[in-house]
Curated annotation (Swiss-Prot):
Belongs to the ATPase alpha/beta chains family. It comes from Halobacterium salinarum (strain ATCC 700922 / JCM 11081 / NRC-1). This is A-type ATP synthase subunit A. InterPro entries: ATP-synt_VA_C, ATP-synth_a_Xtn, ATP_synth_asu-like_sf, ATP_synth_asu_arc, ATPase_a/bsu_AS, ATPase_F1/V1/A1_a/bsu_N, ATPase_F1/V1/A1_a/bsu_N_sf, ATPase_F1/V1/A1_a/bsu_nucl-bd. CDD domains: ATP-synt_V_A-type_alpha_C, ATP-synt_V_A-type_alpha_N, V_A-ATPase_A. It catalyses: ATP + H2O + 4 H(+)(in) = ADP + phosphate + 5 H(+)(out). It holds the Pfam family ATP-synt_ab_N. Has multiple subunits with at least A(3), B(3), C, D, E, F, H, I and proteolipid K(x). The keyword tRNA-binding does not apply. The lineage of its organism: Archaea, Methanobacteriati, Methanobacteriota, Stenosarchaea group, Halobacteria. Keywords: ATP synthesis, ATP-binding, Cell membrane, Hydrogen ion transport, Ion transport, Membrane, Nucleotide-binding, Translocase, Transport. It is a peripheral membrane protein.
């Protein structure tokens, strides 16, 4: 839809304050999209008071001033949904950056626009309905091979009244061609639009019972997230938020990944664009970009568009969820989104809340995270959206408003620790501060699909790490050698849990992804060391001899053992540990 076709009425600018513009003479409604100034800068109505309309503009506003026109479209901010979104990169209002770069180079002109999906590409449509079939909102009417990994399901729009199919075609079509006609006169295309601030409807929201397997041992082993769950990754500068997010985007067992770079550095998005096409999806072996949509709203792009990029991403995620896919959405970082809200709020001269953030910060965060979940769709399928948001508290202070409000909402908390990062322990997730409220509902899945004693093994590791934390304070006062021998041995076992199990190299070809079976196997090797060491200690063997066996250090190399060899390697190490320790008594 071009700007000219969309205009319903025109007003004029009254004042400009950064990204906030006030206009008069507009017959607008809240959240209407408007085009501001002679260049037609895209904006959104955020406040109406009498004849004065307040607009947040999604582009740099320098050069526009009072008296210039404001054109109202009469429509809310919407995204284009259809085949072609995967393997694409958008800005915060779903303008395709790769398409615009081809037209005008690395630096985009203001006021440019392009459809979110290519209207000229031909797609091979394969119908799944026949003339005479009854269809309703959300039903699948056909499929398109969108990428080598994903079959795109063409859906009856959610607002449709449905009806009987009177005509259906198979063959090659563009997204705007009619592929199905109903007896009501409604024509269904492969392309539909949806307002970003409105949640797409579903039949029911269900309790998630299956984990989103991340391939990160500390997450899958200690703090799992469910498919349809919510998680926050807060941490100070340099603690590994972005690397953790990227590892999840690369290796989580979701069908679709939506990665939102919200206010972060441009080179981080560049890294994603360079890495993802080269890396294989661990589930299918196809390129990762074949299941990924990127939304880039970096720190040097307009502040107001950060506010919309989060909603754009979650709406795209909901569309693929409606097809029955499991979607993982990474938002890096929600703090920059909150800062954008703070700036807009201050320009509007609203009453500030804590640290200058708007009073509605908690409500906006809740609206976003509550669109995650495990859902039953209208077409009988089940799909999920898992939302993982990075939080960037200034100075790593978890008591600031964005972290605290996020904590009240999410059910998984992965706290990154600068002390661990400085010790080069990555992922730098603090096991004392982190938690997952999904553990109990996910344990049956791990028991059925991985191993019977998954929960018991995890609890054993947690107990050892808790005991180590208590002993650390004593060690700092009197030294390790002053402890009883059994406590010295506990510290040694805890060291292996930290170094061999919790640490993981995101840059190593093998260690960057660890399947749950291998996660369990490595921990079982450490537990064997624990049990056999205490038996040797009970038999009178000095702790120095127990800790000097040469089989134990092999545990540290299990992470880099190829996945198809780890079972034999763990069994061999267990046998060596047992033999060497029993030789001592």
């Amino acid at each position: 839809m071009s700007q000219a076709e969309a205009i319903t009425d025109t007003g004029e600018i009254e004042s400009v304050s950064g990204p906030v513009v006030t206009a008069t003479g507009l017959d607008a409604q809240m959240n209407d999209v408007v085009y501001v100034g002679d260049e037609g800068l895209m904006g959104e109505v955020i406040e109406i008071e009498g004849d004065v309309t307040t607009i947040q503009v999604y582009e740099e506003t320098s050069g526009i001033g009072p008296g210039q026109p404001v054109d109202n479209t009469g429509e809310p901010l919407t995204v284009d949904l259809g085949p072609g979104m995967l393997d694409s990169i958008y800005d915060g209002v779903q303008r395709p950056l790769d398409v615009l770069e081809d037209e005008m180079g690395a630096f985009l002109d203001r006021g440019v626009d392009a459809p979110g999906i290519d209207l000229d590409t031909d797609w091979e449509f394969e119908p799944t309905v026949e003339a005479g079939d009854e269809v309703a909102a959300g039903d699948v009417v056909g499929t398109v091979d969108e990428t080598v990994s994903i079959e795109h399901k063409v859906l009856v729009p959610p607002r449709s009244d449905g009806g009987e199919v009177v005509a259906v075609e198979s063959g090659t079509f563009t997204v705007d061609d009619t592929v199905v006609e109903l007896d009501t006169g409604e024509e269904i295309q492969m392309h539909q639009e949806w307002p970003v601030r409105r949640q797409r409807p579903t039949v029911d929201k269900q309790t998630p019972t299956e984990p989103l397997v991340s391939g990160q041992r500390i997450l899958d082993g200690l703090f799992p997230i469910a498919k349809g769950g919510t998680a926050a990754i807060p941490g100070p500068f340099g603690s590994g938020k972005t690397v953790t997010q990227q590892s999840l985007a690369k290796f989580a067992d979701a069908d679709i990944v939506v990665y939102i770079g919200c206010g972060e550095r441009g080179n981080e998005m560049t890294e994603v664009i360079e890495d993802f096409p080269e890396l294989p999806d661990p589930q299918t072996g196809n390129p990762l970009m074949a299941r990924t949509t990127l939304i880039a709203n970096t720190s040097n792009m307009p502040v107001a568009a950060r506010e919309s990029c989060i909603y754009t991403g979650i709406t795209i995620a909901e569309y693929y969820r409606d097809m029955g896919y499991d979607v993982a959405l990474m938002a890096d970082s929600t703090s920059r989104w909150a800062e954008a809200m703070r700036e807009i709020s201050s320009r509007l001269e609203e009453m500030p809340g804590e640290e200058g953030y708007p009073a509605y910060l908690a409500a906006r965060l809740s609206e976003f995270y509550e669109r995650a979940g495990y859902f039953e769709n209208f077409n009988g399928t089940e799909g999920s959206i898992s939302v993982i948001g990075a939080v960037s508290p200034p100075g790593g202070d978890f008591s600031e408003p964005v972290t605290q409000n996020t904590l009240r909402i999410v059910k998984t908390f992965w706290a990154l620790d600068s002390d661990l990062a400085e010790r080069r322990h990555f992922p730098a997730i603090n096991w004392d501060e982190s938690y997952s409220l999904y553990k109990d509902q996910l344990d049956p899945w791990f028991t059925d699909n991985v191993v019977d004693d998954w929960a018991e093994q995890r609890q054993w590791a947690v107990d050892i790490l808790d005991e180590e934390s208590e002993l650390e304070e004593i060690v700092q006062l009197v030294g390790k050698d002053a402890l009883p021998e059994d406590q010295q041995l506990t510290l040694e076992v805890a060291r292996y849990i930290r170094e061999a199990w919790l640490q993981q190299n995101a840059l190593h070809d093998v260690d960057r992804y660890c399947p749950p079976e291998k996660t369990y196997a490595i921990l079982s090797g450490i537990k064997t060391l624990h049990e056999e060491s205490f038996e040797a200690l009970d038999a009178g063997v000095p702790v120095e001899e127990i800790t000097s066996i040469d089989a134990a250090p092999r545990l540290n190399r299990l992470g880099t053992t190829p996945d198809d060899e780890h079972e034999a390697e763990v069994a061999e190490i267990k046998q060596q540990i047992t033999e060497q320790l029993r030789e001592l008594y």
